[in-house]
């Protein structure tokens, strides 16, 4: 074998070639063909030394990236990556090769800089690995060498498979098509070992998945198997059977995991194996029988799979292999599916079940395991099966949604919305209809608890999906949302599920997750691995001592002895011992019970537990089960060396049923063991134990650091994959979710809308100017189309802030306030969930990340949705601009809109694609059809999004499952290092695989009688040598779902109880340390035969305020049934118990000393409603079942049940009675219908005992502590009014310190009255005048406030002043007599300072020239302080349209910007309709429906749109002529003048013409009408007439012909001819068709010019886009306006008018931006005033408009011109301010006054300003140089440089660059110390050319200058 081992570097021995084998990212075919083919033996060598891709390895980027990556990890980049843990020597070799390659690159490839790098190749991106972004480098595969694979054989299978799964080199290794035999054999060995790992299933799947698709399986292995036949060397042939066994094992694993996708490759290999085996056998090689059996098994499986493949039933890898049936034809429980099958649901198959044997032994361990597996599975399957069958039979019932089912809960219209990433994998957000569930109180409901199983189907359960509840948030449930995790089989079907698919979901109440883990554990455990079979299965009553005691171990009990003197006595009693260790099997050597602080039975239990391998300890209530259990653990931990007999640690496993019990037990252990504890279970309430939870231990830095390297590498690798997948998946999932939260914007659906429908949608009916309003460009056409736009409901997009939420949720807030004022009660749902959820599995995201995700989701919704249901608004910018209230809807309108959209989105009916294709105009559809079409588009969008994220979903799920297995490996390391591992039964079920690895030798089960036997068995491993069960089977039993299984099949009998019943030895604790004797009497002898009282309970004090420590109050008030949860409540009992609790609180008992128990959840919340937190905070309220193991001083018990039918429910169960009656220490008071309960035998005995001791009756006797002789009887809540303060009805009569008597009734609390507040009047004299205090007695007396007359010294007025206030301190209230500066009288009182601002109204003249009343005090501010007053005077200016301006002086900006004219336009449009818009100068296109029509059809477009010409043949024909043109073309026939020969209805001849429609008038019958003169020829006897079809008027034909054909020279307007009588346009008339068509053609030409051709519009649109991009100042200073213009230009279907509007906006906004930019050159005060003016212009410009009117353009241009002059003037003045003479300053001020006038800037003003500015140019500088123009010219001339040498720094200081003008060095500005100049002819970025100095357009040294020079210099050269 050694001779055949390949050379380590896989190269020829004497070769030094640098060739490396292929890696993951193989070369493209073209590159591969160009490469040199490596020698065959190089590939056969298998594993060349690890390295990167040959190309990637030889360029500097790969090297430096590697260096940087290693430095970032804090390691030397030249160190080997895997030599930290002392791995095999091949890793050091890897390091050397890496270093050699790096050195080789540095020394031998220096010329690579001059070569083209590989990433510059066009084909380089083809090398990317799947799902890798183009910018990322492919991760390089580290090759797996021979030595490395050999080292893996020495390691644990788990480490092997994790290492292979996370290595990129595995795929490369298995990709070779040939390799040496010994290398192939080693690979098979390693793969077989990897696949043997049981805890790493996902890693095994990953490795097998690579193997399945590899050349290793398809080529290498078949060649190897065939080669066995011809192998000549005997030694090698003898080793083949072992290798064949490895291959068969791999094949078996492959077909079991991938039955569908691997059957072809494996079948070929299997067909070759028999031939090779026969050849080997023939050559004398011994073939083991097991190998042949395994091969036969694989052959059988493959034959079965091939048959199924031919049948077409083998399609996916989730196919379940059929196992052969057992001899008795009963399916083996090991192959039974955990989930229900189709046959179980539909065929109602009766399952094969055996009862749990509780009175004898089992025949075998196999039957024992089978029995418990089937019973446990049936316990959760039966309710689901029977519920679904009942549901299927009820589908035709009309009241199905209201019907209640016994076994299941139903959720209608359930939809799988979106996948979500969680730590456990992929979960799905599912939404169901909440309408039938309005009555559900989710915070208490047991619906949809964590771990509950749901079944979903959309085809009446012909197919179904299974899932479990993975997360339950109350807020989400109220909205019908829950998160589900689907099982593996269902996940395969989810790819085809869309968010629009509607399912029926049913829920079974069982905690399925616990069932699943236990059932899987029972299937996996082998019969021989079940411990204690002699006792558990065979029921042998002889129990041996633990095996580890047979080694002679001795115990030290001194740590258990608390008293030092007792320790000494114990040591003296143990004669001959030099140390305190004893033989525990010898009872005589044990310390005394007094020394150990134990009673007799506890001592017996301790001895029994430590000396028997199976110890059962029964502990009745209060007997100290936990105390004894802790003593046992302390003894075991102290003597760990006795049972830890190997180097490997084996912790003690403690299992408890509830989290509370686990906390109690572990806290007790902590008192004697401060370290090495691990807690696994639900969230702990213990601060002490939080440090020992798995989550905390995992997060410790030391733990991470000490983890094996292969786990750390795997963690990083998988985490990276998860993050990448999560990022992509999250975005897609949130997109899917958004589709159900509102209406999508149309642009996101465009891809799924046909072009015809898109054009129709976007060119929809424009009936309101707001549709195309400039400010509503972001408005959604989709909303309008769906009837949700401004035409139907006004849009409100203000977020659901406090002001909106308060209105919308007023009722909820009130309810919330009421809830918050009540005491906190642990919700039953929360309690159940707390025991189900393992804390380590809870996902706790940082609050910061939650906020970030929420913000990102909000942004995504804002981007995608035109209307959001959560905001009930559009979510558009347009909507937000209207948040001032203009578009606010009423609250009920919002609700209607929200409900309407929500209902439509949840509907299932959609339009089919065929139906959609038949639609031409989507606006012609009714609203219902529109929503159907929208849902079709939405489904296409959702399906596409779902497809995109599907691959990421699969990647994340696989990675998460591998990560979960990795976590288990981490947890395994934690648990193995512990001394004590504490688990709940749920935790033990979930961590069963780890427990099998941890192999705890000692298992202690607390509350063992409450645990199902199957759960206990699944917790045990074959390594268990000592099992201690502690519990009490006479208290609560395990809970089963199915009553039949619990009672008739004994499923509810725990292992604890069964072993007791079959006479396995056990010890019962006999002394109770909890209850006073009166209470204990109820349990003995009725429940426990000989339960004795410990002396400590005889010392309890009596309960205050009552005559007895124990009393049962009888009543017969009926109960009430609660609809949800099948619970009950009793209002009478609730009120009584609450009042009794309040009474005990008055006896000065602490709230923590009182517990209220009830037997039903419904009563729990009935009680809560009666208990305000202010009074009852601290009182605990529980249901009995959740209080086992607890105790309190006083227990108040409400039994609830009281009905005429005598149904007592589970009050007849002795176990529950035991728990209920044994929780009290000192006092217990119960209320119930004892007459009904007496029918139960046990209750009858208890009631008899109570009656014997006078402790039962209709009334409870209360005893007053202050008046012992006074008793009060209470039977109902109202009776407690007799003792309002907890004493009696007598008055208190206690004399208080103030002298008054206590006014309360007798009260036992606050006997010294320190807290009492006397409420009687005080009446103390508090001043010299004899006035008395008006306050109540307990309040502190205040200064006298009685008013008396006093004279105020400052003014002499007499005032009524409070007695205690001195006259000098009082403010006189007489009116002030002083006059203000303005002359008006002061309005303040005399004692106050005079007013600063006079409030008298005076009329003043404003700056605008108008007079207006203002407050007198504001006048000065108006004149000098800049105070503004809005002038309300009507403007009245005659606008350009001729109408008076409707605005006010203020709204028109003092005449500078007039408001739009609001008069109706009423001008005739080209289509002959009157304009319906306000008078705005330029009429918009007509929005009416077009009335053009012909005989074939009518135009359906808007009147202002281009009509489509009719292409039907013209129908104008008669017997003389016929037109041969198309209907829309001018006719090619003349009019016919032959009289019509037809007769009218009246019998007279027609008066019309041949071929024309006959007029309806008769010359004889309607003579007056026909001969009425209009044109002048109507009364001629042979006159012929034509009737107009548009208005039915008739005219003489010759006159009408002339009228229709005449062309008047003065006719300017182009419009249709109209009826001479009624003026109706003539549109349809065949005789005058040519004339009409000519007019219509002219009108169409005008329409086209108005709208513009598509080419012109596109050209203009691109021109404006380019123009806008050049406006850098606009982009910088007005970014929102820039973005708005950019978005508008990006829209489709813009008209010429739209583009004209945009062009105007660009121009005006650009001017504004330039002016804004110039503000920095002014004085601060001037800047503020000009900025205000600019903001006014910007505000006016931002108003919504379709176009600018001529008036607006005039006003705007004039104002911008004024501001331009003003800015120019003020800038010049600022620049030369210090050098300006007084005369020039006066001139500047005069120009400024003209420019700052409030009225409009006229042409006269402009001319005057121009003249003055020309005069000022010579003396004021034109730029920021601070010098005059003359001085600038002189300086430039003196320096003498050509243009382009002058520059300025960041702050505008000028400097010059000599020589060529290009910057070659940096310097410092002497004025501001900023950087100036530059390097390499490149100017510093903060500097720029100072064109204001010499007029240069570019620098002297620049590309532009070098190519073109400065333009003027070129001109000079010419």
From Swiss-Prot:
Phenotype upon changing residue 1292 to S:
In IMD91; uncertain significance
Give the recorded effect for residue 1154 to T.
Answer: In IMD91; uncertain significance
Look up what happens after changing residue 377 to Q: In IMD91; uncertain significance
Q: Which residues form a coiled coil?
A: 286-313, 886-967, 1741-1820
Identify one Pfam family in the record. AAA_12
* Keywords tagged on the record: Antiviral defense, Coiled coil, Cytoplasm, Disease variant, Immunity, Innate immunity, Membrane, Metal-binding, Mitochondrion, Mitochondrion outer membrane, Repeat, RNA-binding, Zinc, Zinc-finger
Record-level GO BP terms: activation of innate immune response; defense response to bacterium; defense response to virus; innate immune response; negative regulation of viral genome replication; regulatory ncRNA-mediated heterochromatin formation
Binding residues for Zn(2+): 1849, 1853, 1869, 1872
Q: Give the location in the cell.
A: Mitochondrion outer membrane; Cytoplasm, Stress granule
Disease association reads: Immunodeficiency 91 and hyperinflammation: An autosomal recessive disorder characterized by immunodeficiency, recurrent infections, and hyperinflammation with systemic involvement. Most patients eventually develop hepatic or renal failure, may have compromised neurologic function, lymphadenopathy or hepatosplenomegaly. Early death often occurs due to multiorgan failure.
This chain's protein is named NFX1-type zinc finger-containing protein 1
Give the species this sequence originates from: Homo sapiens
InterPro entries on file = ARM-type_fold, DNA2/NAM7-like, DNA2/NAM7-like_C, DNA2/NAM7_AAA_11, P-loop_NTPase, SF1_C_Upf1, ZF_RZ_dom, Znf_NFX1
* GO molecular function annotations of the record: helicase activity; RNA binding; zinc ion binding
- Quote the tissue specificity entry: Widely expressed.
Q: What is the lineage of its organism?
A: Eukaryota, Metazoa, Chordata, Craniata, Vertebrata
